[in-house]
Amino acid sequence: MSDDSTPKTPSRRIRHTGRRRTLHRFFCKRYTPRSLKRFLRRIHIPADRAYCMRYLADPVSTPVRVFGRTLLSRTYVRFDQQAIAHSADLKRLNAIAASIAKQRGRVNFWSLSMACASVLALLGLVYLIRNVIARRVVIGGSEAVFGARCEAAVVDLDLFNARFRLKNYAVANKHHPMWNLFEIESIDIHFDLLELSRGKFVSHTMVVEGVTWNTPRKTSGALPPRRAKRQRVRSSNPLIAKIQEKAAELAAPVSFGAGFSALKAQVDPRILLEREVKALKTPTLVQHVGAQAPKLAERWTQRVFDAHARAEKTVAAIRAVTELDFHALKDVSAIKQGIETLDRARRSTEEALATARTISHELQQDVHSTLGLAREFAAAVKADGARIARAAAAIRDIQADGGKKFISGLCTVFLARSFSHYYPYVAQMLDYVRGSQRTPSDGSPSAEAEKTAQSLTTRKRLQGVIFCLSATSLPCC
């Protein structure tokens, strides 16, 4: 009988709370040191590896006997199943073993063989339908390039011999569908397949035979019209439409097109030349003088003819008076004729005097107007010369020391035109960026005043054309 006072050794059986569980086979077999090392290497988490090593039993050496003789001894290691006291430990070990069982080798030969078989099947299919693919490529590409039908009797792509043949190749004329643009009897090309796999087309032999132009066709070579794609009418989302409408409303003042237009107006030589030519006064005066000169010449030519005719008439009347014989005036009719002759001479003389006065008055007016045009033309030439000199000075200034100011002005023009009434906020943001890049000031009132003045100068609106500005040209900004 056993003594009740003797302490009992606690049982090392696993206490299961539910159904009976068994340990995974990975922890039930024995391992050599080499195989154990490989097994532990498959446990990638260091904590799990250390946890499994807690249950390793002491290694046992087993002798190996061959033909009744002990040649050597082999060492084996097992996991101590009796040390697993709780079901939680059993569950964790089984989970580790399950994760190891899910691991596969680096090369899955079944998947590799299936992939190779698929590639070979695809290559075989491509080889079988290679001529169909080549025909589609040649015919479709030719029709897309020439815009007319294309026919070919034979299209052969021999990949093993690296040879491409094309027979009876004809392309119709786009503008004359019943005529061929050209027709080729045979095309034979031997190419390098290795260079083609590298993305290069290297042909050793290329033979083109039987090229003819403008040959008649039996069928029309016009392509059928393309079918228009049906547009799906999708119902718009009210929320998305509202968001897009609000975004368009906010982005409406921002127009980079207006900024580029203003920038173009500042630097485009053609616009600058047109602006300067329009501002010149000399071309307008030249056109005015050119329009007035033919009128003056025509009027004074007519005046010369009229004055010459009037002078001849007056001279004839005076000659008639001088030839009048006053002693022969004895009867009433002779006296009457003499009086009429004198009267005609008087009227002719008065008309000649009136014509002379009119010509003198018109001549004075034309002389005054001509002198006025001359003075105006001289002033215009002087003003245009001064304007050209200012433009040249501005250009020299741009090329020399004023380049930075000119570029800064162009940037300001672009930003002001692009962001419209958002420009003050953009300018303020640029001021903040410049202020963050500068070294901190000493806090003196002069430094603060200079900073405020510079900020106001940056945010002020543009005053006008930056390239050149005069009293006769209006600002373009």
From Swiss-Prot:
<protein>
    <recommendedName>
        <fullName>Uncharacterized protein TP_0481</fullName>
    </recommendedName>
</protein>
<keyword id="KW-1133">Transmembrane helix</keyword>
<keyword id="KW-0472">Membrane</keyword>
<dbReference type="GO" id="GO:0016020">
    <property type="term" value="C:membrane"/>
</dbReference>
<feature type="transmembrane region" description="Helical">
    <location>
        <begin position="107"/>
        <end position="129"/>
    </location>
</feature>
<keyword id="KW-0812">Transmembrane</keyword>
